[in-house]
From Swiss-Prot:
The gene is mutS. It comes from Clostridium botulinum (strain 657 / Type Ba4). ATP binds at residues 615-622. Keywords: ATP-binding, DNA damage, DNA repair, DNA-binding, Nucleotide-binding. It holds the Pfam family MutS_II. The lineage of its organism: Bacteria, Bacillati, Bacillota, Clostridia, Eubacteriales. NCBIfam families: mutS1, PRK05399.1. One of its GO terms (biological process) is mismatch repair. SMART domains: MUTSac (SM00534), MUTSd (SM00533). This is DNA mismatch repair protein MutS. Signal peptide: none annotated. The keyword Acetylation does not apply. GO terms for cellular component: cytosol. This protein is involved in the repair of mismatches in DNA. It is possible that it carries out the mismatch recognition step. This protein has a weak ATPase activity.
Length: 932
């Protein structure tokens, strides 16, 4: 038994879209078969049935009504699937044999344009990536708005990942032979991104002609070949899926990565630039604070501003001056914002014009939006700042387009462009004539009904219409005896009525329906002409839309500045960040008003190059460091900042190593991830960079961690090619000695008040280092049981009272020196030798464990509880031991660490149950018995 003709056709079509779920049009339904049906039935909760197809077993099948397809398509695309739409390409009633069918569109996560499934304030980007030798090129397009951006650089995985993080594409198009290991890296970091592959020749085929045809501003001599290949590959994929050239993609914008502030993937996450760490939502992010935009276009543009802060002084100051002028003209700003509220999403409406999917109601929205532009232009002429004056000069009021739409379209047209009721009276004579004929015909129908009621005496008689029988006279069965014999022609019998027609009724029906059909056809043709005229002027509307979005962003920044008492920062060229009474923009919004403690900051590349911050857990060190970075980012966006005064040096890059998390799936422990991040910072930071390092070295033993932290500080300060502005928070109080030995290191700490045995964290950053961590007090605040807290205090007092001071003395390091001498007491060496094998055994048998570290205001990591060397000084003569140091020196002056004290301090009480707490206390008590 062979396949049925329909199933043969289905399989032939399916062969061309193996990676898609095929929606196969059969009558009024889209049907899915075989594996597609199984997937769709599961994802869409549809009943899975079967259909005879000529095989031994029935083909699995499920289907959806074609008129409801958008909802189902949206759900599948949101889940990451691609959908191929196969339509009937001819009228089934007129065809002989199997109906001709073909794929008219492929819908993918990166090419989806249904506004009901897109976030209005977020772009839906699709990205292409092309690699060639040691170079890479990337292009990003949003086909719903017409944006198309390209860039290139030397190939580094980190660079590509940073750009992906910045644009957050839904889909990435790659050359099919790209290394699977790199694809795995992308998927590992961005699991929700869909990956699509195309052949190498699709990136290069007819490259210059394709780009010239698509982009009005393309000049083949201005772009590197690798950039052109990336752009061409993306255009190929868009055409392959959309099956036509989209006229709203008419301009290619090349940008250089180094023209914007670089914020790497980890820093974007740690600083919560556009989404918070916990729920991955906008609330609690910098974007959440700054976004008071009134248009969807402005919301998307503000996100781009935040993702790409500027690094050139003039454009930054232009934005700041414009925001200042808005704040000095509040009434004008309010009028401007009021008009912005009436503007719809011009970019996405003209995107629908380009894809021929716009309806008349959306064009009315476009008309209303354009109608506000002359008023906005008038407001702009009242300002004096360069940015507003340039906008006023460049904005196109689009009066010709507004005039056409206002004259041609009804204010409340039909939703469907193929149902008529679109064109305004007076725009087209033929439309007016047909409408009159249609209206007169319906008046005749109404008069016929009244006449028949009077002549027959049947008050319930009515003249009705349906698509099957046309117009008819309906009389209930109770009144059939009143119907004059021979007056009507019986057409249909119902359970409670009879339906009749008359020759004159059918004659009028033909006139009315003919007029309606012709009217709908003419209105549709007129609508397409109007749509074509708008399409010819898409680039004009896009330019105006971009200016409106910029205005909206500036108004948003002014509104936020006014609401939150922000000030205008001064942008300097002195490599100095000076902030007086700075505040964290997000934290101050989520705590009661007035409770946030402001702090000063001074960081430069000379005497205050590395700010070493010590202090207890939960005191606010991480919040303070993030605050400095966010204020810097805000200033480079062109925003006012939360401070009393701010003098901001432009940074080229911001790096953070805050918090800790395991990457166990990739076989990387907390410490490994931490070291990878620190390595990335040291390799890529420059003297213009701002670096935030929090608890470097905490993921390993105290000696190892302290050594690494110390050497990182030396490397940053002593490397003449680096010397970046750095905030360095640590629990290693021994590092405070570096202020005396390394130029540029300055000690700061978080102020703590001790009142009647109670600890109060003042969250104030003060000059000087801290001398203790208050670990037990933090444990108390976290709710560890009172017996555990009290006993821990007793043990700590006993150990500290019994412990003798010990030290490791190291001479100050010198740049480029490769060795140094550590003075170690004999007792220290003996203790080290006695414990060496035990420590080695513990280290080898220890399992990597993960601790998720969040903002210090809620929780901080307590270091590893590996056994440490108990170094006691007993007054014996010191000996010298030569220690080789790899590329930089480690200098210890005093280490006062006891094995048991360290274990107590390192208890992670936030991740312990009360019973685990008691067990840990019992274990510590047993260990103290051996002290004497």
């Amino acid at each position: 038994m062979g396949l049925t003709p329909m199933m043969k056709q289905y399989l032939e079509v399916k062969e061309s879209c193996k990676d898609c779920i095929l929606f196969f049009r059969l009558g009024d339904f889209y049907e899915m078969f075989f594996e597609d049906a199984k997937v769709a039935s599961k994802e869409l909760e549809l009943v899975l049935t079967g259909r005879d197809c000529g095989l031994e077993e029935r083909a699995p099948m499920c289907g959806i009504p074609y008129h409801a397809a958008n909802t189902y398509i949206g759900r599948l695309v949101s889940a990451g699937y691609k959908i191929a739409i196969c339509e009937q390409l001819e009228d089934p009633s007129a065809s002989k044999g199997i109906v001709k069918r073909g794929i008219i569109k492929i819908i993918t996560p990166g090419t989806y344009t249904d506004s009901s499934f897109l976030e209005e304030n977020k772009n839906n980007y699709i990205m292409s990536l092309y690699l060639d030798d040691n170079m890479c090129a990337m292009s990003f397009a949003d086909i719903s708005t017409g944006e198309f951006n390209s860039t290139h650089s030397n190939f580094k995985e980190a660079v590509v990942l940073d750009e992906i993080s910045k644009f957050a594409p839904r889909e990435i198009v790659l050359e099919e032979n790209i290394k699977e290991s790199f694809i795995h890296t992308i998927k590992e970091r961005f699991p929700n991104i869909s990956i699509s592959k195309i052949k190498e020749e699709n990136f290069a085929y007819n490259i210059d002609n394709n780009l010239k045809e698509q982009f009005n501003n393309f000049n083949e001599n201005e772009y590197e070949t690798i950039v052109k290949k990336s752009a061409n590959g993306l255009l190929y994929y868009i055409f392959h899926t959309q099956k036509n050239i989209l006229s709203n993609i008419n301009k290619i914008d090349y940008y250089s990565i180094v023209d914007y502030l670089t914020i790497d993937v980890n820093s974007r996450r740690n600083l919560e630039i556009t989404e918070n760490l916990r729920e991955k939502t906008k609330k609690g992010s910098l974007l959440w604070v700054l976004d008071k935009t009134n248009t969807a276009m402005g919301g998307r543009q503000l996100r781009r501003w935040i993702e790409q802060p500027l690094i050139n002084k003039n454009p930054i100051e232009n934005r700041l001056n414009a925001v200042e002028e808005l704040l000095n003209n509040i009434s004008l700003q309010e009028d401007l914002k009021e008009d912005l509220k009436s503007i719809y999403d011009i970019e996405r409406i003209v995107g629908k014009v380009a894809s021929k999917s716009v309806n008349a109601k959306e064009l009315i929205s476009l008309k209303c939006s354009i109608g506000k532009v002359p008023y906005i232009k008038k407001y702009l002429s009242s300002f004096k700042s360069d940015l507003f004056l340039n906008m006023e000069k460049c904005i196109d009021t689009l009066e010709d387009i507004h005039k056409l739409l206002d004259k041609a379209l009804l204010d409340n047209p039909s939703l469907s462009v193929k149902e008529g009721n679109i064109i305004k009276e007076g725009f087209n004579e033929e439309v007016d004539s047909l409408r009159e004929a249609k209206s007169n015909g319906k008046k005749w129908i109404a008069s016929l009904e009244q006449k028949e009621k009077e002549e027959t005496g049947i008050k319930s008689l009515k003249v009705s219409y349906n698509k099957v029988f046309g117009y008819f006279i309906e009389i209930t069965k109770a009144n059939l005896n009143l119907v004059p014999e021979g007056r009507y022609i019986r057409k249909q019998t119902l359970s409670n009525a009879e339906r009749y027609i008359t020759p004159e009724l059918k004659e009028m029906e033909e006139k009315i329906l003919g007029a309606e059909e012709k009217l709908i056809d003419i209105e549709y043709k007129l609508f397409t002409k109007i749509r074509d005229f708008i399409e010819e002027n898409i680039d004009r509307m896009q330019k105006t839309a971009r200016i409106i979005s910029d205005i909206d962003c500036l108004c948003s920044l002014a509104t936020v500045a006014l609401e939150n008492n922000y000030i205008k920062p001064n942008i300097n060229a002195k490599d100095e960040i000076l902030i007086e009474e700075g505040r964290h923009p997000v934290v101050e919004k989520v705590i009661p008003k007035g409770e946030f403690i402001s702090n000063d900051s001074l960081i430069d590349t000379k005497e205050n190059q590395l700010i070493l911050i010590t202090g207890p857990n939960m005191a606010g060190k991480s919040t303070y460091m993030r605050q400095v970075a966010l204020i810097t980012i805000m200033a480079q966006i062109g925003s006012f900042v939360p401070a009393k005064k701010a003098n901001i040096s432009i940074c080229d890059k911001i790096f953070t190593r805050i918090g800790a998390s395991d990457d166990l799936a990739a076989g990387k422990s907390t410490f490994m991830v931490e070291m990878w991040e620190v390595s990335n910072i040291l390799k890529n930071a420059t003297s213009k960079s701002l670096v935030l390092l929090d608890e470097v070295g905490r993921g390993t033993s105290t000696y190892d961690g302290l050594s690494i932290a110390w050497s990182v500080i030396e490397y940053i300060c002593n490397n003449k090619n680096l010397r970046c502005k750095t905030l360095f928070a640590t629990h290693y109080h021994e590092l405070t000695k570096l202020e005396d030995n390394i130029e540029g290191v300055k000690n700061y700490s978080v102020s703590v008040s001790e009142l009647e045995n109670e600890i109060v964290f003042l969250r104030k950053i003060i000059r000087g280092g801290a001398d203790q961590s208050y670990g037990i007090e933090v444990a108390k605040l976290a709710g560890l049981p009172s017996p555990v807290i009290n006993r821990a205090k007793e043990i700590l007092q006993h150990i500290e009272g019994d412990k003798e001071e010990n030290s490791l003395n190291i001479t100050p390091s010198k740049e480029y020196k490769s060795k140094d001498y550590i003075e170690v007491s004999k007792d220290t060496l003996n203790t080290k030798n006695n414990l060496e094998s035990e420590i080695k055994h513990d280290t080898l048998s220890e399992t990597n464990t993960a601790t998720i570290i969040e903002d210090e205001s809620t929780k901080e990591h307590l270091s590893s509880n590996k056994k440490q060397i108990n170094c006691k000084r007993n007054g014996e003569k010191s000996i010298k031991k030569e220690v080789a140091v790899d590329s930089f020196q480690i200098n210890f002056e005093h280490i006062k660490k006891d094995k048991i004290i360290e274990e107590i301090k390192n208890i992670d009480i936030l991740n312990m149950t009360p019973m685990e707490g008691f067990n840990k206390l019992y274990d510590i008590i047993n260990k103290t018995k051996d002290i004497d």
